Structure formats: C-alpha cells, structure tokens
Amino acid sequence: MSARSQALVPLSAEQQAAWRAVAETEKRRHQGNTLAEYPYAGAFFRCLNGSRRISLSDLRFFMPSLTAEELRGNRSQWLYAVDVLIETQGEVCLLPLPGDAAERLFPSVRFRVRERSRHKSALVMQKYSRQQAREAEQKARAYQALVAQAEIELAFHSPETVGSWHARWSDRVAEHDLETLFWQWGERFPSLAGMERWQWQDMPFWQVIAERSLAAREAGHAVREMERWMVPNKLREAA
C-alpha cells in the first residue's frame, strides 16, 4: 500500500502532481521509453502547472526568494535536487532545496523515516540482546570451567594445606561455590569428621578454613600422615 493511499486528508495540488510525476515516469521507464534529463522534475512541473520547460518561476515553488542571479550557474543542481526528491518520494532532499521540501510534497515521509529508524533500532537491539546472551553464556561456561579446575586442585590438598587452595581461588570463584566444594571434599578426612556445615554458617568462610587447617595440624601424627597419603598425588608418588 502506497503512502498516498494511507493519507487521511485530501492531497494538495502539488502533492497530487508529485505522485502523478512518480507514476508517469515509472510507467515510461518500465515501458522502455527514453527518458529526458531530470524526468521526475520535468513531470512534476508539467503535472503541477503545465510547464514544458522548467523556469525560474517554477523553481520558486520551493524557494520564493530565489533570484535569477542565484539560479545562474546552479540550474543543474536545482533540477537534480528536485528530480531526486520526486524519484525517492521525499526520502532524499538535497541542497539547494530547503529542508521542508520533502514534507511539502510527501507529508508521510516523516512517518516513513521514523518507522524505518524504529525498525533499525529494534534490529540493533535484537542483535545486541543476542550478543549479550552469547557473551553471558561464554562467561558462564568459562566460570564453570574455573569451578571445575578449583575442584580438581582441591582434591590434591589435605586439611593442612587447604588454606593455600582457598587463597589461590578466593578472588576467582564465588565464595558460595568454594564453600560447596570444601564441604563435599572434607567429608573423607578424619580430622574434619563431625563438622556440620550449618554449625559454621555464621562464621566467615576464610575463618572456617583457617580454623580447620589449624585443627588438622594439631591432630595426632597418625591422622596427619593418613590424610597426607589420602591425597592423590601422594598415592602416585608411593607407586
């Protein structure tokens, strides 16, 4: 549906002339007829006032104050600007035409430009949202890889050395994830037996680590030795 058919008010004479110029010139072009130079501009003024040759008086339709001196040497620029204005149905308004020339002949151009801008903005936002989603997914995967690496490294620590593990990962993995890894890991060590997570929930995690490391170092020699040999790398060394 054309912008003309969407109009809610009757078209003025110049608006009707502009749309007739578009229709007639496009028809001649599709029929393969040879078009004169600046065919849309010529058709517009012919439909508007019957002019066969575009004169200063015709161009004053766009700028009433235009003088012969101003037109001299610039006639081609004026005709080209009018031709492009009509051909693009107001989408392109070049100098020396005044800024309101497009809306005078094609009032719907403002709506069309605004809708196109809105559509473009929507596409940009959609692309940005997809990009954000991809980046968020990549960050989540990278973070999960860090958590997995922290879990692997924790397996090679005993309660005596777990403090160094916490120091290494405390600024790279969220504390609640470190806590989960710690409590799962600690279930297999005798020196940590009997520890219940809920009993330590009001204590900062770094303090839990410090106290459990101290308790492990104060445990009996047999317990410490057993826990050291429970660490996988110790088992490999023994082999």
Curated annotation (Swiss-Prot):
The keyword Glycoprotein does not apply. Pfam families: PsiA. The keyword Lyase does not apply. Keywords: Plasmid. Coiled coil: none annotated. InterPro entries: Uncharacterised_PsiA. Not yet known. To PsiA protein of plasmid F. This is Protein PsiA. The gene is psiA.
